Curated annotation (Swiss-Prot):
This is Phenylalanine--tRNA ligase beta subunit. It catalyses: tRNA(Phe) + L-phenylalanine + ATP = L-phenylalanyl-tRNA(Phe) + AMP + diphosphate + H(+). It is found in: Cytoplasm. GO terms for biological process: phenylalanyl-tRNA aminoacylation. InterPro entries: aa-tRNA-synth_II/BPL/LPL (IPR045864), B3/B4_tRNA-bd (IPR005146), DNA-bd_dom_put_sf (IPR009061), Fdx_antiC-bd (IPR005121), Fdx_antiC-bd_sf (IPR036690), NA-bd_OB-fold (IPR012340), Phe-tRNA-ligase_IIc_bsu (IPR045060), Phe-tRNA-ligase_IIc_bsu_bact (IPR004532). One of its GO terms (cellular component) is phenylalanine-tRNA ligase complex. Residues 727-820 form the FDX-ACB domain.
Length: 820
């Protein structure tokens, strides 16, 4: 945000240089990126002088050029070739001398001696647009006869210079989005540093209603979105160019002057942070302003001549017949004041930040008004700024104040009450701050001391400080004004020590699994814990009712905490796929957050919130890069399943003691889940639905696995690793071809096998699945291998046949299996 050095001095008196002011602001948290000397006209008209055309003759080699001699007031006249049709002898003109830099937007060029059609030219006679004082290019500037040759153009045009401070306002500092807001903080800095300073703003005591010739009523139908709305009329105004001082003020901070009425509103928003709007009162049909919402899809044409479809959640400023303005965001095409306007209705309001922010995002608009409203303006400044605007309109545009202030306020803004402990101040800052210093700082920041004890203060924080509502916020303010550099680095460091525990074990295992995944070709990703609530619309397993929503999000794309890692990974896949990198394996460790309204407890606010640590895996695209050694093969859900099983094995879990079953989940087209026998879900994995992939513009199949790291850590607490000697006796393998119903899973066969022979059965492997020719409908064939081994003896055929017969019988009885 651009802050004018001279403008700042109108509100607080100080003797710091521009660079010292920038350093002071940076030290108190208003980081100032740079200081730039500026003029009301770019370049300050340096090198331009007033000249008198002595002679003007036609160019011998051109039908439109003229050869002139010009008196610049300091020596011999100069010869200048000029192409303007209106140049003539005897004129007083503006001349750019050799070496002068002229600007065209961000580009500039230097005036040099040159030959034009064979005739030497040592300068340039200028038009309005060439030096930045206007837009006319029809001919050169012709000055009044009393203009004196040799006068510097910057003196003739009374060019003003200033210094602009580029202040980077953080999102929480809505109160500093104006010159007066910055002046408040600078005032506190000056007081803390022993300077004599006063903070002042223009008086509005002169505001007086002169007649009631133009009463316009105000009706607020949606007080949630608009807690405070006020307006007043000024009758008999003349809309014209603003006086030079006002134009200069705006130009110096990069704002283009428009007319006196609009410039007044722009002046006030940059001076005090209160957005205003001046309606042409003659266009307010029915002499009534109504603040309300309109039906979904209502068309509305804004000032930029774009027709927008309104949402039923867009707050609108309307008259009796039609909408005039998107509240707090953008005016309508016919809502503003023009040269034909004679009466104005000035609006000043406090719109709810959330409503303004969502409307601005919906329509892709970012205006000076929405920038401030969505962060939270000073609710106590509504009437002050309205009165100031009315007085300025009366002064600069004429007219009379022709109505009482129509003030609709449903909620009087209250101060934030904060209990401040001296002990906590000193503890958080790391230094004992004198009590008198603390009191001086908080009062210089316009906080009122409501009560004082030996232990601390009760403070009333003004409502414009939306970022200061807790004691730690006040302490932060105390520290920044006291000065970070005034807190010495301690010579000793105190720290509490703890023995290694579960957290350290979890970290080691996390690193172990991460190394395993990297070895399998995965890349680790790290996504924002904040995500878009719209991703959860229509989901049952991850209902939007259970989202942890942000009260004051900066963006609709980051307005809630994630319930699942899935969507962050899909964003990463989409980002890579759009850059021709579609063969991907990702993993991410991160927290997921959950809100449960049923657990609401006034005494335990956090009882409704929970968070769990998860591991997410994403696989998509080709299994391996194409080469002569590897055929073109896509990744599959079975590949992902193998990765999940390997992780569980690496953590020491016995897969035979886990329960695998089908999972119905609206993020998966098909999926399985892995549970402990006690019913705790350890993992789920499957094929992501086409609907979700389409929302991210992903064409390839994506396979996703979610592992609950917290439950995994609980499960491995009971895992005991035992070592045994490698058997000296050979293992025996037997294969069976089983005909089963199509819906029977291999996991069921595996479970029955291990339940049948607990001692000698070591492995069960599926090596072929067949459906089709010679297999009846609704059936499939599993080819399964069984590995048997005894650590004490060599197995003979009789022992093996007995085990296999028992196994076949159990499969026939429980799964209706038949041998092929």
């Amino acid at each position: 945000m651009n802050i004018s050095y001279n403008w700042l001095k109108e509100y607080v008196n100080f003797d710091l240089t521009p660079d010292e002011t920038a350093a002071a602001l940076t030290s108190i948290g208003l980081e100032t990126g740079g200081v730039e000397e500026v003029q009301t006209i770019k370049g300050g008209l340096e090198g331009l002088v007033i000249g008198e055309v002595l002679t003007c003759e036609e160019h011998p080699n051109s039908d439109h050029l003229h050869i002139t001699t010009v008196n610049l007031g300091d020596g011999e006249p100069v010869q200048i070739v000029c192409g303007a049709p209106n140049v003539a002898a005897g004129q007083k003109v503006v001349v750019a001398t050799l070496g002068t830099k002229l600007y065209d937007g961000d580009e500039c060029f230097t005036i040099k001696k040159s030959k034009i059609r064979g005739v030497e030219s040592t300068g340039m006679i200028c038009a309005e647009d060439e030096i930045g004082i206007g837009t006319d290019h029809a001919g050169i500037i012709v000055l009044p006869a009393e203009a004196v040759p040799g006068t510097l153009a910057k003196d003739y045009y009374n060019i003003k210079s200033d210094y602009v401070l580029e202040v980077d306002i953080t999102p929480n500092r809505a109160d500093a989005c104006s010159h007066y807001g910055v002046a408040r903080d600078l005032y506190a800095y000056l007081i803390q540093n022993g300077k004599q300073a006063t903070l002042q703003r223009p008086s509005v005591d002169g505001f007086k209603v002169e007649n009631h010739d133009l009463d316009i009523e105000v009706v607020v139908e949606n007080s949630e979105a608009c807690p405070h709305y006020a307006g007043v009329t000024v009758k008999g105004v003349t809309v014209k160019e603003s006086p030079e001082w006002l134009q200069n003020k705006l130009r110096l901070i990069g704002v283009r002057p428009i007319n006196n009425v609009v410039d007044i509103t722009n002046y006030i928003v940059h001076a005090f942070g209160q957005p205003l709007h001046c309606f042409d009162a003659g266009k307010i049909k029915g002499n009534e302003v109504i603040v309300k919402t309109l039906p979904e899809g209502t068309p509305f044409v804004t000032l930029d001549e774009v027709e927008r479809k309104l949402s039923e959640r867009d707050l609108m400023i309307c008259n009796k017949e039609e909408a005039m303005c998107i509240a707090g965001v953008f005016g309508g095409l016919d809502s503003g004041s023009t040269e034909a306007t004679t009466d104005v209705f000035i609006e000043s309001a406090y719109f709810h930040p959330t409503w303004v922010r969502k409307t601005a995002r919906r329509h892709g608009l970012n205006t000076d008004a929405s920038f401030r409203f969505e962060r939270g303006i000073d609710p106590n400044g509504v009437i002050y700024c309205l009165k100031l605007a009315a007085l300025m309109v009366k002064e600069l545009a004429g007219g009379t104040i022709s109505s009482e202030i129509k003030d609709v306020c449903v909620a009087v803004p209250q101060d934030f009450m904060v209990e401040l402990s001296y002990e906590k101040v000193n503890s958080l800052i790391g230094k004992v701050i004198p009590v008198e210093t603390i009191k001086s700082i908080v009062t210089s920041l316009e906080m009122k001391i409501m009560n004082e004890t030996v232990d601390g203060l009760t403070l009333a924080v003004p409502p414009y400080r939306v970022d200061v509502q807790r004691d730690c916020d006040v302490i932060e303010d105390i520290l920044r004004i006291y000065g970070y550099n005034n807190v010495e680095i301690p010579t000793t460091l105190n720290s509490s020590l703890t023995t290694k525990g579960e957290h350290d074990k979890s970290n080691k295992l996390q690193n172990l699994v991460a190394e395993q995944l990297v070895g399998c070709g995965f890349n680790e990703i790290l996504n924002n814990s904040l995500t878009r609530a719209a991703y959860y619309d229509g989901l049952e397993n991850y209902s939007s009712n259970h989202l942890v929503m942000l009260l004051n999000p900066l963006s609709a794309d980051l307005n809630c905490m994630r319930q699942t890692l899935l969507f962050g990974g899909l964003e990463s896949i989409a980002h890579n796929a759009n850059r021709k990198n579609a063969d991907l394996k990702f993993f991410e460790f991160g927290n997921c957050y959950y809100f449960d309204a049923d657990k609401k407890n006034p005494e335990k606010v956090l009882a409704t919130y929970s968070e769990d640590y998860h591991l997410g895996l994403w696989v998509t695209g080709k299994k391996v890069a194409n080469s002569w050694a590897h055929p073109d093969e896509n990744s599959s859900v079975y590949e992902l399943k193998a990765y999940v099983e390997n992780i569980l094995k690496r953590l020491g879990l016995d897969l035979h003691n886990l329960v695998v079953g089908n999972l119905t989940d609206d993020i998966f087209a098909t999926a399985l889940s892995v549970h402990t026998k006690g019913g705790k879900r350890l993992a789920s994995f499957g094929v992501v639905t086409k609907k979700l992939l389409k929302a991210f513009d992903i064409d390839n199949e994506v396979y996703y696995a979610d592992l609950n790291w917290k439950e995994l850590m609980k499960a491995i607490r009971s895992v005991k690793i035992s070592y045994k000697e490698i058997s000296k006796f050979p293992a025996v393998k037997r294969d069976l071809a089983l005909l089963l119903d199509k819906n029977v899973q291999f996991a069921e066969i595996e479970k029955i096998a291990y339940d049948t022979e607990k001692k000698l059965l070591k492995e069960v492997e599926l090596f072929d699945v067949y459906e089709g020719k010679n297999i009846e409908a609704g059936k499939k064939s599993y080819a399964v291998s069984f590995l048997l081994q005894d650590e004490t003896q060599t197995l003979n055929d009789k022992m093996i046949d007995k085990i296999m017969s028992k196994l076949v019988k159990n499969l026939e009885d429980k799964l209706n299996a038949k041998l092929r």
